[in-house]
A protein has these predicted regions:
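Domain-terminus/edge residues, biased toward the C-terminal soluble/receptor-binding domains
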Residues: 155-159, 167-172, 176-385
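Residues in and immediately flanking transmembrane alpha helices
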Residues: 15-16, 79, 282-285
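Hydrophobic alpha-helical segments, especially transmembrane helices
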Residues: 3-4, 67, 245
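Sec-dependent N-terminal signal peptides of Gram-positive bacterial secreted proteins and lipoproteins
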Residues: 2-25
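Intrinsically disordered, low-complexity repeat and linker tracts
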Residues: 12, 24-26, 286, 290-292
Length: 385
């Protein structure tokens, strides 16, 4: 059994090496240089870095702070702590917040969806505090959870003092840490229902407040569908953005740009460079069955078809050659009955001999256990007369 599986694995690996060989092209002459004080550009799926500059330096990040707040909000939404249709009463404290706001009225109720939209599209401080108070009882309790989450994620250059990003000497983060926060946020698909909005309005009942997305790239850069701006005198002009074209999704963060135009120019340049110089191809597709099967003991079928549990993509420079191989490690004992979705092994993807991802190999079908009568039928089918 072991020898048989080893042979299958070898064939499987060679096949994929041929299929995903990255073609060599003439090296591009242009390079990426960003003007902002700190920057970090990476592939979303693999986390591979395309460009970095002072990425670990602790700097004020202004309203990009709200990225962590939004992570908490969508976590709570997923956990059922609240629904988008919930009414949330705005406190006097929340309605009195300075800076960017949508002019929420004290003691008035707003749908949770309206508050999230206000934070994501308009960077509203009043809506931010209203959500923090609804979920944690107070802004300070929310900030404690934000810092706890930062520690959990290994964001060693991040410390929060409020949930809005308003200036505080004890509040900072880094370009690299912000990229992690944004990567976590966009894993919540509900987020994109708001982040792609260009213009909308907030309904106060007797009046409406028109809002426009502070992230201009949502409208003016093809593929940009999310992100967060920030500005204070201390932080300079900041932007964390994400864009997708084909299989490739990029994350770009810049801190302390010279002006509003320069931050958008920097992130646009980062996206352009990434999409032009890199490629992202599917190595394992969870919707497709694998080209190999594995023997099943005591099953009505001798072999089980498999598929990857999750997708794995290969991210690489277009002008560099690279080989991709996949190893399959079967489970120790694969016995019927088997249900579709049961783990039957593990798949490990390598690029140039370095592991870049792994996922379970799961059964793509149900296989029942042989009965006594199945064995009798098998014996009978082998009789000769």
């Amino acid at each position: 059994m072991k020898k048989f599986l080893t042979a299958i694995t070898a064939v499987f690996a060679v096949t994929l090496m041929l299929a995903f060989h990255i073609p060599a092209k003439a090296a591009a002459a242009d390079t990426l240089e960003l003007k902002s004080k700190a920057a970090y550009v990476a592939d979303y799926r693999s986390g591979e870095v395309i460009y970095s500059k002072n990425e670990d330096e602790r700097l004020p990040i202004a309203s990009m702070t709200k990225i962590m707040l939004l992570n908490l909000c969508f976590d709570k939404l997923d956990e059922g702590e609240f629904t988008l249709n919930d009414d949330i009463t705005v406190s006097k404290t929340a309605s009195g917040m300075g800076g960017s706001q949508v002019f929420l009225e004290s003691d008035k109720r707003y749908k949770a969806s309206e508050l999230l939209k206000s934070i994501i599209v308009a960077s509203a401080n009043d809506a931010s505090v209203a959500m923090a108070e609804r979920l944690y009882g107070s802004e300070s309790a929310c900030v404690d959870e934000m810092n706890s989450k930062a520690k959990e994620w290994g964001l060693n250059n991040t410390l929060f003092s409020n949930c809005t990003g308003l200036p505080k000497p004890t509040q900072y983060s880094s370009a690299k840490d912000v990229s992690v926060m944004l990567s976590r946020l966009i894993a919540h698909k509900e987020y994109f229902n708001y982040s792609k909005i260009w213009t909308d309005e907030i309904d106060h009942g007797d009046r409406k407040t028109e809002i426009t997305n502070t992230n201009k790239l949502v409208r003016f850069y093809e593929g940009c569908d999310g992100g967060k701006t920030g500005y204070t005198a201390e932080s300079g002009f900041c932007l964390a953005g994400t864009a997708q074209r084909g299989n490739m999704r990029l994350i770009a963060v810049v801190i302390k740009g010279e002006n509003s135009k320069s931050r958008f120019a920097d992130v646009s340049s980062a996206f352009n460079y990434g999409f032009e110089h890199y490629t992202c191809k599917s190595a394992l597709d969870s919707s497709k069955e694998l080209a190999i099967t594995v023997k099943v003991e005591k099953g009505v079928k001798k072999n089980v078809t498999m598929r990857p549990e999750t997708d794995i993509y290969v991210f690489a420079e277009k002008n560099k050659r690279g080989d991709v191989s996949i190893d399959f490690n079967p489970a120790e004992k694969i016995k019927a009955p088997i249900k579709a979705g049961d783990k039957v092994g593990e798949l490990i993807v390598y690029r140039d001999g370095v592991e870049i991802g792994r996922t379970n190999a799961i059964s793509a079908e149900n296989i029942s256990r042989k009965t006594y009568f199945d064995y009798i039928r098998d014996v009978a089918s082998n009789w000769t007369f």
